[in-house]
Regions:
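Solvent-exposed, acidic/flexible segments
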Residues: 56-59, 100-101, 118-122, 140-147
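Early extracytoplasmic/lumenal segment of secretory-pathway proteins
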Residues: 37-47, 96-108, 124
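Loop/turn elements at helix/coil->beta-strand transitions in domains of secreted/extracellular proteins
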Residues: 53, 72, 111-113, 132-135
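Extracytoplasmic substrate-binding proteins
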Residues: 35, 45, 114, 124-159
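Extracellular/periplasmic catalytic domains that process cell-envelope and extracellular macromolecules
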Residues: 48-49, 108-109, 129-131
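A short, structured surface patch at a secondary-structure boundary
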Residues: 60-110, 114-119
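Bacterial Sec-exported substrate-binding components of ABC uptake systems
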Residues: 3-5, 9, 18-61
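N-terminal hydrophobic signal/anchor transmembrane helix of membrane proteins
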Residues: 52-71, 144-158
């Protein structure tokens, strides 16, 4: 009986250890005093000095991640009927254009302090935004692992 109890306690400790927060160098704020430091799917380290207040999301699939963590937006990509329904929270958020043809000028007019972009469509636009000193997270959405990682990264961004 003691062996079974000891085994159960050991198993519970292993489970609790697995649930403890991990120090992930790619997503910890460290001692730099930054709000968050994340690495996007280009391998670019994006440092956010403070919690973003004016986020623009350039992809409808990435918009779903922002909605999942109840994030506020300053701008969003056009959502077509076939892409799914737009959460009510984002109905009045300015539209920056369709995923394949986002307007740089409209994005800049939103005065974003962070842009979340798709690796499939926005590499060139990301470079232009970064030239304007706007932090850009470029994320993939192809695999299940991408989906899990995106939820973690966007959750970190929104706190």
């Amino acid at each position: 009986m003691k062996k079974i109890c000891l085994l159960i306690v050991a198993f519970c400790l292993v489970l609790l250890t697995g649930c403890a927060p991990q120090n992930d160098a790619s997503q910890s704020s460290g001692s730099s005093g930054a709000y968050a430091v994340v690495t996007d799917d280009r391998g670019t380290v994006v440092t956010l000095a403070r919690k973003p207040q004016r986020v623009v999301v350039l992809s409808t699939s990435l918009l779903n991640f922002a909605a999942a963590v109840d994030g506020d937006l300053a701008g969003r990509a056009t959502v077509k009927a076939e892409d799914g329904s737009l959460p009510e929270k984002y109905q009045q958020v300015p539209d920056v254009g369709p995923v394949y043809n986002v307007s740089l000028e409209t994005v800049l007019a939103c005065q974003p302090d962070l842009v979340i972009a798709s690796a499939d469509h926005h590499e060139k636009l990301a470079a232009q935004l970064e030239e304007s000193h706007i932090p850009v997270l470029v994320l993939k959405t192809k695999t299940y692992d991408d989906v899990k990682r995106n939820l973690e990264v966007i959750g970190k961004v929104y706190g």
